[in-house]
Design a protein with these regions (language model features):
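Short, mixed charged/polar active-site loops
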Residues: 16-18, 135, 244-245
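N-terminal active-site segment of His-dependent metallophosphoesterases
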Residues: 1-81, 87
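Binuclear metal-dependent phosphoesterase catalytic core
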Residues: 125-132, 219-278
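His/Asp/Glu-rich metal-coordinating catalytic cores
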Residues: 57, 68-229
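Non-catalytic terminal accessory segments
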Residues: 1-17, 259, 266-280
């Protein structure tokens, strides 16, 4: 891109883009048939939300799968649901701590999603993907080893004024401190969020929805889309005129509700406290 092209891009209006942000689906966690059916029903509800919202990109910010031992049958059933994503949309998946991108990763062993429409953020140093039609780029650094030394936002690229800048990360928010006491694995500090310079930071790792925006950085944990036998919600993120970012909660619904046995409660829709799962 030349200087004159950059100037023209910077002064022209960015297109409106809608993101659907989710995380922590933990597909493959259940060993019984009913549990497996529920996992797929939740994914169906997430996919249906893309169609209903006319979402452009579906962002899965870690722990799409519960572990790296999931087999071919689970992946094939997952892909059958992902094939229902609307034809205009794309899927971006960031490996988290449960489905980390190590040598035995499910993402190395199997194809996930439709070729040409699915991106796995699989570079240990961080991968940046440009969606030219939306003038939007997505960056994320996959979890390789879930430890206190892994900083999910390390190496994030500088902000580009002529594009939408979206960052994905999977880890534990530590507030203004750089680390917790006792230390937590995959820490993310408020200072790191501010330093990224992204228009939106899609976070995963916490099961409950939480706004951890800091300074000018709009950063949210989507929370898991399923809570206690009830469908939850996804984040509906509209990148719009004037470089405004509007984040709303979109409750999930659909045919899968009957299989699951209920809908989200009011409790699951409330902002989360700053907590994380104890097994992480």
């Amino acid at each position: 891109v030349t200087f004159h092209q950059r100037t023209a891009l910077a002064t022209s209006a960015l297109p409106t883009v809608r993101l659907i942000h989710t995380s922590d689906l933990h597909i493959g966690a259940s060993l019984d048939e009913r549990g497996q059916a529920i996992e797929l029903a939740v994914l169906e509800a997430v996919v249906d939300s893309m169609t209903a919202a006319r979402g452009d990109l579906l962002l899965v910010a870690g722990d799409f799968f519960d572990n790296n031992r999931v087999g071919r049958a689970t992946v094939e059933k997952t892909n059958a649901v992902l094939d229902r994503l609307p034809p205009w949309s794309s899927l971006v998946v960031l490996p988290g701590n449960h489905d980390s991108f190590g040598p035995d990763s499910v993402y190395r062993r199997y194809r996930i999603g439709s070729p040409g429409r699915t991106v796995i953020l699989d570079d240990p140093a961080g991968r940046c993907v440009l969606f030219a039609q939306h003038r939007l780029r997505v960056w994320g650094r996959p979890t390789i080893t879930h430890s206190e030394n892994f900083r999910p936002l390390a190496g994030a690229p500088a902000r580009q004024p002529y594009q939408w800048n979206v960052v994905m990360a999977h880890g534990h928010f530590t507030g203004e401190a750089s680390q917790c006491d006792p230390p937590r694995s995959s820490p993310i500090s408020a200072g790191e969020l501010r330093g990224v310079g992204a228009d939106y930071i899609a976070l995963g790792h916490w099961d409950l929805r939480a706004d951890v925006s800091s300074g000018g950085a709009t950063a949210w944990y989507s929370g898991a889309p399923f809570h206690g036998w009830q469908l939850g919600a996804v984040q509906d993120v509209l990148l719009g005129p004037g470089r405004q970012v509007r984040v709303t909660e979109r409750p999930l619904s659909g045919p899968g509700e009957a299989a699951i046995g209920g809908r989200r409660s009011e409790e699951t829709g409330r902002p989360a406290q700053v907590i994380g799962r104890t097994d992480r």
